[in-house]
A protein has these predicted regions:
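Single conserved hydrophobic/aromatic residue that forms the stacking wall/gate
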Residues: 1-9
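Helix-loop segments that flank and shape redox-cofactor active sites
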Residues: 36-45
């Protein structure tokens, strides 16, 4: 339950009492740390901690960012910058090499369990497939994301436009 008087998560915006957040990775981390403990967090004393932090940053800065530019120019401003849209799509696809390689011998990205890193990185794959950038589904990424997207919690989360709690 919210520690503030109300919690609201709506259209990628979190309000929890006096706390207001707009960045998705920060929101996920905040919720786990404020309302945990949670196995979704990799702690500093775990071997994969640095990798975990890197994947959290990688999810938005390296993977989701080029998709947002692609979304803008391929779907919202068609014809304005078609070359830029295709360039950002290619950039995104090239950045998947690291993820595909990481998943060669792993079920999850960090600490041999489902963590926030999986949630945050898989959003980029979900967005890519929503935009029909199906080239993102390299074999290991496809296996991993299928498992994540079949989780009951994922199905519940994607079945609603937003969640509001008072």
């Amino acid at each position: 339950r919210s520690r503030g008087s109300e919690m609201c998560i709506r259209d990628r915006y979190l309000k929890d009492g006096k706390v207001e957040m707009t960045e998705s990775v920060a929101m996920c981390t905040y919720l786990c740390e404020q309302y945990g403990p949670s196995d979704l967090i990799v702690s500093p004393d775990e071997d994969d901690y640095a990798d975990y932090l890197n994947w959290l940053a990688h999810s938005d800065a390296t993977l989701t960012f080029p998709l947002t530019v692609y979304l803008r120019y391929a779907l919202q401003e068609v014809g304005v910058a078609d070359a830029a849209a295709e360039g950002y799509k290619r950039w995104f696809l090239a950045r998947l090499r690291l993820l595909e390689k990481k998943l060669e011998s792993r079920e999850y990205l960090c600490s041999d369990r489902f963590t926030l890193a999986d949630i945050c990185v898989s959003y980029a794959i979900y967005l890519a497939t929503s935009l029909n950038v199906n080239e993102a589904l390299k074999p290991n990424i496809a296996r991993w994301s299928e498992k994540l997207f079949n989780r009951d919690a994922f199905k519940r989360a994607t079945s609603q436009r937003f969640i509001e709690e008072s």
